[in-house]
Amino acid sequence: VGSVVCFVGAIGAVLMVNMKMNMWLAILIMFVIGTLIGAFQGFWIAYVRIPPFIVTLAGMLAFRGLSNVVLQGMTVSIKDCTTFVNLFGGGADCYIPDFFGNGPINLTCVFAGVIAAVIFAVLQLKNRADKVKKGYEAPNMGSTIGKIVVIAAVILAFSYRLAQHKGIPSVLIWVLIVIMVYGYITSNTTVGRYFYAVGGNEKATKLSGINTNKVYFLAYMNMGFLAALAGMVTIARMTSAQPTYGQNYEMDAIGSCFIGGASAYGGTGTVPGVIVGAVLMGVIKI
C-alpha cells in the first residue's frame, strides 16, 4: 500500500510540476495508474494463484524503487499547485468556512456534529427496528440507547474540539465520503456480501456459484484505486512528493484492520470498525 501511495504521488507531482500538465488530467492519470496496479496484482493473485503475500511483497519493493526512479531521488514540491493542494486538504486554510459568522467557535462545525449525532441515532434505532420486525436477533433497547449515547457524545466532543480550532478540515470530507461509500457497499450490495463470503470461506463461496476469482480481482483493483486517492492526499498534505513517503503504511493498515475488528482469516469486520482502529493507531503513534 505505502509503495503504491508513494509511486502514484510521485507520478502526479512530476506530471503537474515538471510537465505542467492540467491538474484534472493528472488526477485522472493517477487514478488510472493506481487502479491498473491493483488490477495487475489482482490478476496474479486471482487467476495465476500466486500467494498474495508474495505478490504484494514484490509490489512493495518494485514500486518503492520506481518511485525513486521517477523522482530521481529528489523532492518535488507542489506548493505552487494551490488548487490541487486545497482540493485534497493540504493547505493551511483548507477548512470548511463558518457560514454562521466568524466567532471563536465555528458554529458550522458544531451544527454538523449535531446532525451527525442525530443521523447516527436514527440509523441505529431503525436498524434495530428492522431486525425485530424481520424476527432477527437484535440487541435490547438499553444497550442500543447506551451505544447511541456514548458514540453521540464522542461525535459532539470531537466536533466541538474542531470548532475551537478552525472547523472541519477539507480532508475530513474525503474520509467521510470513503466511509459512506464503502460502508454502503459492504453492507447493502451484492458485491459487498461477496467480499465477506470469499473472506470467510472461499471454497464454500465457489461451490455456491460465485466467481471467486473475479471477486479477488475486483478487491485488489479497488485497493489500487484507494491507494491512488491516498497518494493524492499524502502529497497534498506534505505539499511535495518524496521517495520515502508511505513507509510503514502497510503495518498501519494491518493494525487498523485488526484493532477495528477484522480477522486475519477474513469474513468479519466493518468499515466503521476499521476507522476506529485507524484513530487508535494514530493516537498510539503521536
Predicted regions and their residues:
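Hydrophobic alpha-helical transmembrane segments
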Residues: 3, 7, 24-32, 54-57, ...
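Membrane-interface helix caps of multi-pass small-molecule transporters
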Residues: 14, 19, 36-47, 70, ...
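Alpha-helical transmembrane segments within multi-pass membrane transporters and channels
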Residues: 21-61, 276, 281
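Transmembrane alpha-helical segments in multi-pass inner-membrane proteins
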Residues: 28, 36-38, 220-233, 237-286
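Pore- or pathway-lining transmembrane helices of multi-pass membrane proteins that form conduits
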Residues: 48-69, 80-81, 174, 245-260, ...
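Transmembrane helix-bundle core of multi-pass membrane transporters
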Residues: 63-186, 243
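Membrane-cytosol interface at the C-terminal ends of specific transmembrane alpha-helices
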Residues: 176-199, 250
